[in-house]
């Protein structure tokens, strides 16, 4: 069975064979779901027909033909089949102001108040909150295979299977451990970062106040 897990501070969602169930949601199991994205007190489900349903951040009624979703604190974004991005809800820091001319997007990831897009040419574009430079993409960044925005930082996985992070490092969450190689997936959280290696082991670093980097 195909299984996907998405979690946040106060709830966890599990997607299995097209059915989504969240631990803090008393609603019935949601069917015909192909992706689930858990944000702060909000969960968005992408249905097989390309529509989106969110528990709190209600999606625009006209939104359709969606292929991927991402949600975090108080905003959400959707990647559409035409490779364009639509975002909605809170815009305090401009996090839903999708840059004009942004096209050929193949992936999206949201931080608390910033949004990032991975383009087909393996470059990255971010917008929104920039108080910790989390939206300033390094000028020499290229060959990106995956992007993951954390609370106030951003990480990418490159073609050479190396991780690169920028933005706030108050807890050291952007300080990628030296010698970390053979990475196949990266994920940024509140103040810690985790990477999955090709040998199916996981390496996490920095803030560990709740044992979030201890295995």
Name what the model sees in each region.
Residues 11-14, 22, 42-45, 54, ...:
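Conserved core positions of repeat-based scaffolds
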Residues 11, 33, 51-52, 66, ...:
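Intrinsic low-complexity tandem-repeat regions in disordered proteins
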Residues 29-30, 60-63, 99-101, 138-139, ...:
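Surface loop/turn motifs at the tips and blade-to-blade linkers of beta-strand repeat domains
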Residues 1-27, 31-38, 43-45, 52-59, ...:
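An edge-strand/N-cap motif at the start of beta-rich repeat modules
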Residues 7, 15, 38, 46, ...:
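Residue-level recognition of a conserved intra-blade site in WD40 beta-propeller repeats
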Residues 9-11, 40-42, 73-75, 90-95, ...:
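Consensus positions within tandem repeat domains that build extended binding/scaffold surfaces
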């Amino acid at each position: 069975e195909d299984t996907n897990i998405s979690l946040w501070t106060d709830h966890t969602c599990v997607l299995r064979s097209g059915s989504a169930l969240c631990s803090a949601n008393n609603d019935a199991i949601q069917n015909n779901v192909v992706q689930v994205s858990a944000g702060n007190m909000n969960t968005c489900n992408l249905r097989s027909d390309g529509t989106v349903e969110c528990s709190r951040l209600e999606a625009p009624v006209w939104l359709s033909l969606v292929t991927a979703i991402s949600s975090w604190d108080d905003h959400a974004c959707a990647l559409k089949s035409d490779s364009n991005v639509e975002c909605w809800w809170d815009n305090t820091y401009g996090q839903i102001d999708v840059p004009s001319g942004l096209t050929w997007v193949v992936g999206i990831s949201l931080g608390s108040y910033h949004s990032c897009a991975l383009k087909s040419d393996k470059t990255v574009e971010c917008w929104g909150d920039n108080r910790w430079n989390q939206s300033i993409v390094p000028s020499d960044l290229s060959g990106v295979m995956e992007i993951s925005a954390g609370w106030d930082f951003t990480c990418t996985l490159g073609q050479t299977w190396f991780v690169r992070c920028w933005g706030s490092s108050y807890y050291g969450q952007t300080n990628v451990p030296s010698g970390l190689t053979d990475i196949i997936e990266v994920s940024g959280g509140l103040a810690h970062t985790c990477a999955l290696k090709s040998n199916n082991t996981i390496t996490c670093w920095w803030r560990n106040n709740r044992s979030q980097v201890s295995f």
